[in-house]
């Protein structure tokens, strides 16, 4: 039969040729359709910049305190002049910020699910800026606590930013946008501590530039005022570029726009191609309108989801351990070598945190996108949690290292010891910043498991779990550190044993995320 076809007359050859041509065209269409499906959704740069500015305000409101908060508390006089008691009070200041955040997260998240993201986020960010500046004018410990609580109440809008990211992205651009969003935290934690460590007591350090009476009377006002100015710029940028992303409001806006322009569009689409495009667009929009408007799920219903519960539980350990590493590191560096610390000045502490932020920034920019595209997200999350036991174990080695070259007479370190100490701190900071990848992954896991109509509430639940950990973490971790050093338990290193144990429990808890997400995918 094949031989007969090869010797057939022209009509059959023409038929075969047409068939081959049609097949080629069909294959080309399939390739084009496949490429369209795989094409990455364009990233709205204006929107991305708007949410970056909003999130950076919350980060800077906290990061600028780390280098000088212990010295600030000591100068206020609440610790009775004993540096070993500073840790408890400085931890309390950091805790009340998170406590205020816990109290407002649910209310602000639910409110944003009803009235929109912008009306809640922009005023909250502006309020944080004001209370951040006022903190530098504190003259009593009570005033410090009050201002931090007020700022924390407004910082409860953090999950709204997470929801905006989820609503702006899809599966085609998640691996790029989420690491970029996660880049905000290390950038903020690089800039904030640098501002705090450099500008505290600016009138004394730089009398020719900041030698004003205001900065002499309030030596911690300038490092609080600069983040406030940056926040005001961020709010202004967000006001003009951050658009509403709440799905129900976006759909209502599109429906109104379509109704207004339906008559003009019908007249303009007179050609066959235009009419076809109009019919296709109308069909898609009608299908979107016919999609039922599901109400947001309640808190109880979301908590019943095993995936949400696993992310909440593991997120609690993640935030507790991550915050503990920063709190203890700051206190560890502030404490004198003979008291069980490293004995660095606030300026050097600020530089250390800035370097840590730069390391995290490079990881988020260069490594995280590739990791998210290559490996399973739940397994990467578990890997990040596994780094915490090593972080605290290595941190406990800094004081013994410093003691090898410490002169009790001159209160100085030998140059060789100083070099080794800085090298160890660099390795520690590099290892600690590996954990940063877990935060954007947690947000992506919430998006995978939560209903889109309840996204802000689901993010709020996870954020509440994390914020509760951050509320109690500074007080607990700093108290454990102070107790172990003041009572010289295990040579002042009892806190290392406690933190390593908690880290191992967190590692075990993170294994549940991989199990529940795999189970949910199989359903």
From Swiss-Prot:
Membrane disposition: Multi-pass membrane protein
Biased composition (Polar residues): 1-26
Coarse class of the protein's main subcellular location: membrane
Region Disordered, annotated ranges: 1-45
Location in or out of the cell: Membrane
Keywords from the UniProt entry: Glycoprotein, Membrane, Transmembrane, Transmembrane helix, Transport
Name of one Pfam family that matches: MFS_1
GO cellular component: membrane
Transmembrane portions of the chain: 88-108, 125-145, 149-169, 175-195, 221-241, 317-337, 352-372, 382-402, 419-439, 455-474, 488-508
InterPro entries the UniProt entry points to: MFS, MFS_dom, MFS_trans_sf, Sugar_transporter_CS
SUPFAM superfamilies, per database record: MFS general substrate transporter
Keyword Membrane (UniProt): yes
Single annotated GO MF: transmembrane transporter activity
Glycosylated residues in this chain: 269, 410
Protein family (similarity comment): Belongs to the major facilitator superfamily. TCR/Tet family.
Role noted for this protein: Major facilitator-type transporter; part of the gene cluster that mediates the biosynthesis of psilocybin, a psychotropic tryptamine-derived natural product.
Full protein name: Major facilitator-type transporter psiT2
Source species: Psilocybe cubensis
Phylogenetic classification of the source organism: Eukaryota, Fungi, Dikarya, Basidiomycota, Agaricomycotina
């Amino acid at each position: 039969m094949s031989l007969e076809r090869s010797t057939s007359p022209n009509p059959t050859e023409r038929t075969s040729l047409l068939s081959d041509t049609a097949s080629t065209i069909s294959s080309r269409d399939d390739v084009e359709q496949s490429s369209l499906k795989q094409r990455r959704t364009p990233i709205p740069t204006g929107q991305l910049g708007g949410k970056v500015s909003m999130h950076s305000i919350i980060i800077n409101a906290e990061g600028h305190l780390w280098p000088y908060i212990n010295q600030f508390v000591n100068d206020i006089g609440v610790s009775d002049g004993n540096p070993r008691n500073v840790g408890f009070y400085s931890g309390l200041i950091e805790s009340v910020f998170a406590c205020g955040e816990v109290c407002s997260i649910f209310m602000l998240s639910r409110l944003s699910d009803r009235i929109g993201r912008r009306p809640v986020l922009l005023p909250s960010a502006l309020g944080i800026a004001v209370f951040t500046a006022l903190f530098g004018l504190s003259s009593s410990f009570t005033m410090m606590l009050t201002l931090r609580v007020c700022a924390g109440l407004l910082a409860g809008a953090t999950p709204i930013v997470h929801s905006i990211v989820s609503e702006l992205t899809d599966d085609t651009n998640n691996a790029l946008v989420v690491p970029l969003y996660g880049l905000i935290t290390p950038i903020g934690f690089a800039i904030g501590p640098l501002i705090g460590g450099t500008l505290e007591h600016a009138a004394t350090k730089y009398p020719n530039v900041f030698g004003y009476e205001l900065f002499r009377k309030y030596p911690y006002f300038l490092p609080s005022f600069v983040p406030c100015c940056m926040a005001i710029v961020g709010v202004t940028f967000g006001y003009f570029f951050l658009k509403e992303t709440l799905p129900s409001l976006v759909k209502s806006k599109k429906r109104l726009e379509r109704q207004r322009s339906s008559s003009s569009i019908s007249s303009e689409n007179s050609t066959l191609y235009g009419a076809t495009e109009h019919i296709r667009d109308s069909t898609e929009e009608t299908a979107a309108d016919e999609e039922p408007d599901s109400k947001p799920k309640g808190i109880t219903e979301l908590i019943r989801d095993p995936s949400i519960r696993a992310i909440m539980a593991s997120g609690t350990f993640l935030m507790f351990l991550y915050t503990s590493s920063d709190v203890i590191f700051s206190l560890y560096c502030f404490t004198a070598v003979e008291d069980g610390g490293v004995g660095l000045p606030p300026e050097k502490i600020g530089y250390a945190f800035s370097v840590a932020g730069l390391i995290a920034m490079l990881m988020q920019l260069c490594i995280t996108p590739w990791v998210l595209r290559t490996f399973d997200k739940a397994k990467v999350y578990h890997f990040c949690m596994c780094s915490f036991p090593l972080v605290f174990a290595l941190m406990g080695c800094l004081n013994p290292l410093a003691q090898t070259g410490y002169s009790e007479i001159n209160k100085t370190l030998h140059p060789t010891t100083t070099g080794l100490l800085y090298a160890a701190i660099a390795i520690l900071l590099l290892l600690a910043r590996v954990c940063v990848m877990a935060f954007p992954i947690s947000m992506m896991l919430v998006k995978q498991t939560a209903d889109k109509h309840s996204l802000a509430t689901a993010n709020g639940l996870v954020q509440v779990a994390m914020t509760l950990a951050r509320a109690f973490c500074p007080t607990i971790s700093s108290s454990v550190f102070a107790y172990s050093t003041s009572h010289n338990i295990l040579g002042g290193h009892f806190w290392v044993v406690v933190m390593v144990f908690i880290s191992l429990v967190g590692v075990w808890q993170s294994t549940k995320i991989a199990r529940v997400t795999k189970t949910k995918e199989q359903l």
